[in-house]
Amino acid sequence: MLDHAAEMKSAAKAGRDGPKPLAGKSVAMIFEKPSTRTRVSFEVGISQLGGTPLMMSAQDMQIGRGESIEDTARVLSRYVDVITIRCFSHDMLLTLAEHATVPVVNALTERSHPCQIMADLQTMIERHGPLDGQIVTWIGDGNNVAASWIEAAARFNFQLRIACPEGYAPPAELTAWARAEGADLVMYDTASEAATGSQTLVTDVW
């Protein structure tokens, strides 16, 4: 996926027409939680791939007036080709995906933010080359974005260092899972220690 994204970005920068896998397709964007960067990047990306983004806030939908997420999933699946959702509850995402008959993309929940991490990984490759052996440091609360970094560390060959305020570490079961999957995960007590020698620093609330 990252290689394909790099090829498409390179073609766009060179002024060449890239593939349009979303040509003639509509993508619903349910944003229960407001956003600037996520919304703009999704809308622009969908348009560049030939699709039509349909922005939908909870206030604009029947879901804001009591319609179940199950019914919303079924109805939207009849109209659109893809559903993206940015919501407060991960369970809402899972329920939507279970009852939809079209692909569902996680644009953020309280547990994870995978699309942001994929974009960050692409930036790391552009700046520093292959991910193998790179060192990334997360400085901040062990929140949803940190969780997605931990999941990425279990899938790619880079070292992830984490420095969190006391009492705000990522869930122990998540870090245990990642290490069992082969993640090179190191916890630090201070941000300065964690940052030393890193190629990439990612910061959040402290």
Question: What is the predicted role of each segment?
Answer:
Residues 1-40, 44, 112:
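Positively charged, low-complexity intrinsically disordered leader regions
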Residues 19, 73-74, 81-152:
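Anion-binding alpha/beta catalytic cores of soluble intermediary-metabolism enzymes, centered on
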Residues 26-79:
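Active-site cofactor/substrate anionic-group-binding motifs, chiefly glycine-
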Residues 32-44, 127-204:
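Glycine-rich phosphate/diphosphate-binding loop of Rossmann-like nucleotide-binding domains
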Residues 49, 99-100, 156, 181:
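Short, structured coil segments at secondary-structure junctions
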Residues 59-60, 108-112, 165-168:
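Short, acidic/turn-prone active-site loops that include or flank metal/cofactor-
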Residues 77, 97, 194-196:
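A short, aliphatic-rich alpha-helical micro-motif
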